[in-house]
Amino acid sequence: IITVHAEACTHLDRTIEKIKESGVLASVALNPATDLSCLDYILPKLDMVLLMTVNPGYGGQKYIPYLTDKIRDLRQIVEKRNLKTDIEVDGGVTLNNVRGILDAGANIIVAGSAVFHGDVRSNVEEFLKVM
């Protein structure tokens, strides 16, 4: 899968087409303040949407709470349009918020700092219990 940031791509539709023509799964990442409307016409072409729940740049940032609504909104759009698009969330995912993130509609999570700071095995086991 190749993920491109919507904000960094001048010709998003063409980029997605080129990725798909290569036989690769295509995904678009959205920064926290980017509106879901930028996906209106390309969503059916996407295999996944990555919602950044922190501002990109460095690890260990806190999850931005209002983005749970954005996850929920995207899940509703995907279901309303009868699509199979995965929703990935990256940024500030912890044991304290992962259940709410999944309940809102994400089905793929990135939990970097929450897993790799401390005992990795124990952290993974704790995530699996919550999930």
What spans do the regions from the language model cover?
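Glycine/small-residue-rich loop that forms an oxyanion/phosphate-binding "nest" at active or ligand-binding sites
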Residues: 1-28
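Hydrophobic faces of well-ordered beta-strands that scaffold small-molecule active sites
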Residues: 2-4, 26-30, 49-51, 85-91, ...
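Glycine-rich phosphate-binding active-site loops on the catalytic face of alpha/beta enzymes
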Residues: 4-10, 50-61, 104-124
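Active-site beta-loop-alpha junctions enriched in small/polar residues
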Residues: 7-9, 29-33, 54, 90-96, ...
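Surface-exposed amphipathic alpha-helices with a cationic face
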Residues: 16-23, 70-81, 125-131
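Glycine/Thr-rich beta-alpha phosphate-binding loop at enzyme active sites
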Residues: 32, 42-72, 76, 80-86, ...
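Catalytic cores of alpha/beta
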Residues: 34-46, 91-109
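Conserved, mostly hydrophobic/aromatic
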Residues: 49, 74, 90, 101, ...
